[in-house]
């Protein structure tokens, strides 16, 4: 709501700062720059500081910025305030996706679809809220003793214009949300350091950086085409299609965003029974086919309505499904999530600006439809490449796991063989020592027997006894004997 409320109240803001629409157009640039800065900074801080605390601070900064907007009487001050609001929105987009991915991990599909549905719901509610603030404000000219025309311009205390009340209402709602986040932070346990995270919850694809960069380009094309189509479909219908009324063109615009929001709501249910990759593939196919129809039948009224509806429905689930899909193959941290948001923001700025410039140069050419087709073709090329790179880590990881097990088994078996060889060598040395001792004793007995012939019988007996004892000792000390003895003990 904080972002969408700017459109319906843009003329009121110009009047509030007493400037022209052209002079305050810089607030969009300021908000976009703040959004980019908040996305990058949030990606770094969300890995270091408690995530609920950062979300609470960002929501509090958003509420403060919206409260200050009605008192901004200078275009420069209004641009600075919008930069702060944009920065807090960058924090919110990055942090919201990170918290959901970290909390539900592989089951984050329905939850991240619900998050992005809330974005579409807020964009739908903001214009209605801005209109209701003017119609149901409980103030009248009698309470302030002012005339009817002046009541429409300044019917609130402190010089606040009545049209600025929507910023106060939305700011109050966001302030309450920030208080709940601070309460959640006070009840949450301290987060463990990333170094203590288990390996099961942290996985990295073999081509992690390549997948992240390609998904950055994917979101750049997707979000740029989405914003360009939603922004220029009304102008395209008025300028390019002949014999068309403003109500018809406005109906195309409402159809696109209405189907977009409705399908995002239905995607919460679809995500419970479909894989994120399946939903992303259906979105890519739907965008490609519908944009092709819009190019081939760019002047056909019926197919323009059908193509717009299908294109809006296909666009609805692409961004959240992309987050859920890549989380299945590689862990998405703060920096990666911020890179996705930055890519989307850059596409939101670059592609619509390019469409506007080219449409002015070639008014008789359907630039918008060809831009949609080019973006859809680019995403259709990027998705198979990303899938191939993301799934390559499964085969490689399995190969590395088998290879490490084999290497571990070989090392253990070689270690056992070396121990057996050392033990056998030691026993062989012991056998040789025993044989040498027997030879020495044999020689000594022989010498004695030669010197004393009369003692030949006892010498023979002693010689025979010595041989028997030596053989038994050698047999008892040999590995084979030891093995047989152990076997007998076991038996």
UniProtKB/Swiss-Prot annotation:
It comes from the Eukaryota. Disulfide bonds: none annotated. Pfam families: MFS_1. Gene3D superfamilies: MFS general substrate transporter like domains. Residues 440-458 have a biased composition (Polar residues). Keywords: Cell membrane, Ion transport, Membrane, Sodium, Sodium transport, Sugar transport, Symport, Transmembrane, Transmembrane helix, Transport. Belongs to the major facilitator superfamily. May function as a sodium-dependent glucose transporter. Potential channels for urea in the inner medulla of kidney. This is Sodium-dependent glucose transporter 1. The gene is mfsd4b.
């Amino acid at each position: 709501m904080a972002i969408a409320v700017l459109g319906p109240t843009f003329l009121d803001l110009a009047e509030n700062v007493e400037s022209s629409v052209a002079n305050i157009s810089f607030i969009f640039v300021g908000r976009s720059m703040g959004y980019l800065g908040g996305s990058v900074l949030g990606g770094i801080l969300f890995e270091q500081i408690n995530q609920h605390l950062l979300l609470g601070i960002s929501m509090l900064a958003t509420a403060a910025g919206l409260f200050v907007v009605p008192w901004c009487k200078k275009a420069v001050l209004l641009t600075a305030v919008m930069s702060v609001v944009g920065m807090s929105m960058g924090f919110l987009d990055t942090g919201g996706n990170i918290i959901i991915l970290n909390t539900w991990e592989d089951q984050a599909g329905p939850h991240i679809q619900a998050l992005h549905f809330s974005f579409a719901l807020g964009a739908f509610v903001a214009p209605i809220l801005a209109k209701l603030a003017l119609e149901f404000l409980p103030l009248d000219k009698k309470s302030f003793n002012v005339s009817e025309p002046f009541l429409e311009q300044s019917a609130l205390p402190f010089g606040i214009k009545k049209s600025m009340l929507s910023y106060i209402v939305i700011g109050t709602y966001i302030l309450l949300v920030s208080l709940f986040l601070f309460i959640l932070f006070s009840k949450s346990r301290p987060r463990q350091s990333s170094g203590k995270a288990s390996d099961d919850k942290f996985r990295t694809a073999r081509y992690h950086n390549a997948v992240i960069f390609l998904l950055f380009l994917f979101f750049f094309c997707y979000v740029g085409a989405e914003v360009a189509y939603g922004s220029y479909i009304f102008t395209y219908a008025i300028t390019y299609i002949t014999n068309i009324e403003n109500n018809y063109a406005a109906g195309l615009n409402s159809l696109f965003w209405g189907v977009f929001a409705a399908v995002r709501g239905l995607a919460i249910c679809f995500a419970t029974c479909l894989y994120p990759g399946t939903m992303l593939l259906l979105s890519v196919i739907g965008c490609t086919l519908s944009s092709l129809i819009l190019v081939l039948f760019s002047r056909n009224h019926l197919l323009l309505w059908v193509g717009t509806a299908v294109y809006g429905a296909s666009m609805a689930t692409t961004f959240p499904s992309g987050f859920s899909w890549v989380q299945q193959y590689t862990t998405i941290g703060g920096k990666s999530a911020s890179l996705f948001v930055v890519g989307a923001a850059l596409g939101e700025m670059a592609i619509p600006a390019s469409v506007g410039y080219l449409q002015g140069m070639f008014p008789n050419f359907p630039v918008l439809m060809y831009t949609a087709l080019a973006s859809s073709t680019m995403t259709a090329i990027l998705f198979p490449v990303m899938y191939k790179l993301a799934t390559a880590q499964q085969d490689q990881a399995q190969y590395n796991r088998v290879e490490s097990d084999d290497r571990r088994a070989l090392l253990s078996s070689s270690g056992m063989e070396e121990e057996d060889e050392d033990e056998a060598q030691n026993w062989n040395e012991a056998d040789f020592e025993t044989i040498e001792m027997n030879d020495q004793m044999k020689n000594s007995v022989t010498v004695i027997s030669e010197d004393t012939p009369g003692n030949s019988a006892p010498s023979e007996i002693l010689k025979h006894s010595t041989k028997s004892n030596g053989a038994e000792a050698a047999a008892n000390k040999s590995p084979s004997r030891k093995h047989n003895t152990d076997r007998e003990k076991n038996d």
